[in-house]
Amino acid sequence: MKKNKIFISIASYRDSELIPTIENCIKNAKLPHNLVFGISRQYHPDDKFDDLSKYKKDKRFKIIESLWNKSIGVCHARHEIQKLYNDEEFYFQLDSHHRFIKDWDTKIKKTFRSLIKKNHKKPIISSYLPSYDPDTKSKDEDKLNDVWRTYIDRFMPEGPIFIFPESIEDKQAEPEPARFLSGHFIFANGSFVNEVPYDPKL
């Protein structure tokens, strides 16, 4: 096991926020040398906003690139990214549009380890996260610090459950048990990759 290393899985489909997300992730990490990025970039040749050329010589980056019209979907992309995992201690799955608090890496590891000490053998930290303004000028700054839970809003006519986030008014310091997982934010032990692999056909 590669102790303290975080494997960060990001599937991106022509997302102009991919580069800002990577930059913000590294900038706000306390220990950026412990980050390992697995990225699936699904792109159009005319797009320049998500060009990863500057990261290709960085040993922390493992990049899969495919044309937009060859995309099979996010589950397939995440399945391919999981093949890049190499025994890092932690697995962190994100969408390609995020912002990070200062020292996010040490803080989330501390929270994760505190859950293990409380006899949660394989905790998974997951949530819908507050939205943000790409220019970092939020119209409602308070929402950036909201703690959200995920709940069932309704069953859709096609059958699937429509899951929706809601703010937790009592901003407790510890995570609360949850029934659902949000694919755009999953922090777990690295063994998650092998124990709960993505089905590429979903």
Which residues does each PLM region occupy?
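Catalytic cores of eukaryotic secretory-pathway lumenal/extracellular enzymes that build
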Residues: 1-202
